[in-house]
Amino acid sequence: MFYAKGNYFSYTGANLKVGTLVYPAPEPGHAGLGTHLTLDLSGRIKFGPDVEWVDSPHDLAVNESRLAQTVREVKKYLPGLDETLMLPDYAGIRPKLGKQGAVAQGKGFVDFLIQKEEGYQGWINLLNIESPGLTSSLAIAEKVRMLLYT
């Protein structure tokens, strides 16, 4: 198991008039799906997550040295960003089956591993289901049903 920490930074300025989420297209060779722009429930802008490989799943402090890289990624789709208005916000851990794995080899993302667990009746593993896991939930349920009952 490998741990990909995602650092998030919030934007304190009022000069960006954004009313929707922004999910940039993934770039080949990157370990993640890009630095997103999301809005929290109060309408605050947040940028993240990035991908920082860490040894511990308990390392939840925002790595402030990642700010410059986040700014570079965000300016690709929001060139008017004032980086002086960005602050560390929070971090989370995403467990991964492989450290960069196929992504580092240029083969794309490895996700949606759905399989029976040999030796355990009725046990189905649903591994590495990331974005768009919720959108895919009905198709995932159908696959699980097929594995259990056919």
Language-model features, listed with the residues they occupy:
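Active-site substrate-recognition segment that forms the wall
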Residues: 1-119
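Glycine-rich phosphate/pyrophosphate-binding beta-alpha loops
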Residues: 27-28, 123-137
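Repeat-unit-sized solenoid/scaffold elements
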Residues: 51-58, 127-130, 141
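Short, hydrophobic/amphipathic alpha-helical packing segments
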Residues: 67-71, 134, 145
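Internal hydrophobic alpha-helix adjacent to the cofactor/substrate pocket in enzyme cavities
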Residues: 138-150
